[in-house]
UniProtKB/Swiss-Prot annotation:
Gene3D superfamilies: FAD/NAD(P)-binding domain, GidA associated domain, C-terminal subdomain, tRNA uridine 5-carboxymethylaminomethyl modification enzyme MnmG/GidA. It comes from Thermotoga sp. (strain RQ2). Keywords: Cytoplasm, FAD, Flavoprotein, NAD, tRNA processing. NAD(+) binds at residues 277-291. Belongs to the MnmG family. One of its GO terms (molecular function) is flavin adenine dinucleotide binding. It is found in: Cytoplasm. NAD-binding protein involved in the addition of a carboxymethylaminomethyl (cmnm) group at the wobble position (U34) of certain tRNAs, forming tRNA-cmnm(5)s(2)U34. InterPro entries: FAD/NAD-bd_sf, GIDA_C_N, MnmG, MnmG-rel, MnmG-rel_CS, MnmG_C, MnmG_C_subdom, MnmG_C_subdom_sf. One of its GO terms (biological process) is tRNA wobble uridine modification. It comes from the Bacteria. FAD binds at G15, A16, G17, H18, A19, G20. This is tRNA uridine 5-carboxymethylaminomethyl modification enzyme MnmG.
Amino acid sequence: MRPEDDRVYDVIVVGAGHAGIEAALAAARMGFRVLVLTVNPDTVGWAPCNPAIGGPAKGVVVREIDALGGEMAKTTDETMINVRMLNVSKGPAVRALRAQIDKISYSRTMKRKLETNPNIVLRHGIVERILTEKGRVKGVVDNYGIDYLGKAVIVTTGTFLRGKIFIGRSTFPAGRMGEFPATKLTESLIELGFEVGRFKTGTPARVLKRSINFSVMERQDTSDEPLAFSFFDEPRVLPKDYPCWLTRTNPETHSIIKQYLEFSPLYGTVKLIEGIGPRYCPSIEDKVVKFKDKESHQVFVEPEGRDTEEYYLNGLSTSLPYEAQIKMIRSVKGLENAIVTRPAYAIEYDYIDPRQLYPTLESKLVENLYFAGQVNGTSGYEEAAGQGIIAGINAALKLRGEPPLILKRSEAYIGVLIDDLVTKGVDEPYRLLTSRAEYRLLLRHDNAHLRLAKYGYRVGLIPKWFYEKVLSLERRINEEIERLKKVIVKPSDRVNDLLTSLGTSPLKESVSLYQLLKRPQLSYSALKFLDPNPIDDPEVVEQVEINVKYEGYIQKMFEEVAVFEKYENYEIPHDLDYDAVPNLSTEARDKLKKIRPRSIGQAMRIPGINPSDISNLIIYLDRKKQ
């Protein structure tokens, strides 16, 4: 018998990608002993596709993870080499940060953070079997036959479940390029009753810096404004040493792709790929086939880090044979002499139907077994990390005997993501978009900590000083808004000349600074000339401007949320006998039995359930309460 401390843990995390890291750190920081098993401990938090974190919706998720006490934002700040705020010219609801990271440094930093946490053991091992006893998880067994016992298990296997790589008609098993797949764990999950599907994704080739002609490409430098993902970090301006570059495909590129389509594992005469690929991150052959009228597509040439000369060709993801790849790449302006260091490839992998999970990400089939990340049918590092921290927090809360953390759609993009997964399921790799969030004006990049720090503090992942800093910010925002309402500006030649010069109409009667700030042409800084006591706090000013200018829209959304909350708070007993509910359609009855929504609100979002089904369900539940 092995020593107990080598065999028995509180929480076992399977996989050390972006989901596994956040799950492990959350559970460990909440006081539990955590074992992290991974195929390769040297590729912790690896970025196998684009060397970037953030983007529309995704960047907000990174801020939400930070507000809950996670690590992705801090490590991005530590290792980023180029960062920009996207959609600056648009409204605050769609603004988000995106950073190029030094992917090698990011991975090493995350590995160090796992290894230096006294509650975490990071160990090599490919998990092959989930151990259960009386419907509850008991532990895992790895490829060496070594068993580990745990009170909770979190599966974060990414693309490793029966992973298979495709380059043209060449195919071989792999979790990602150069790493073994997990070939047997899927069988164990199927034996436990899980429904499993197959998805595919892909990554472009990497090319050597010295072979790129940057002089004919459009340069994209890091921001001149100080920026940071984490609220803990001081925003800073990065040196302009690692720009990204923009070029485009052309008719010759598309001609080469069409010429080799018959050798594509997706489009070719021999169809090798069964899995469905990501709609919002299509391969270049997908784009050429589906958008025949487009003469060119963007290609972003992105640095992979400080200590590597490899560049990532964002926009040229493909599974065509290498002969096609080199010709296609060299047809692109600036890449005529490109030296390929790694070929592009597609990878097919297993995922579980996420409708088999509760909103806590615990499975409905096996108690204390959680799933997070790409194994749930999502795509993207940020989506994975967001699920990871929720799974880690909820596993720890359950072991503590405390209520779970379930973020609402009106509270966080992470809430939207998980609700979509467990309610609607997936028929393609799921990517978060701003359009998926009906309350996106409330779920902004700038207010993530105001929304969520209370939960991070409640579960013990946010220190008291930080939470007090957030509360102080909230208080100062409210105080400044109230002050602006009290400062009255009277019409005068000086005032009206200033307003006219700023492109807005002159005053005919006295108004408050609050009312003036509502005008789209006027910023807080522009009103300083009319304000006896303006504040000089950029964080407060940003929040004040947004809250004042968008007050009508924000208020309308809060009213919608109030209606939403009414149905969200109308709980449905988990053991409800849906066969006893009269007048339900057959489709509604089947779906309600399968998903077992926790509330009327969640039931309303299940595809195929119509308003009359909901009415009949409410009538039945109301009668049961009487």
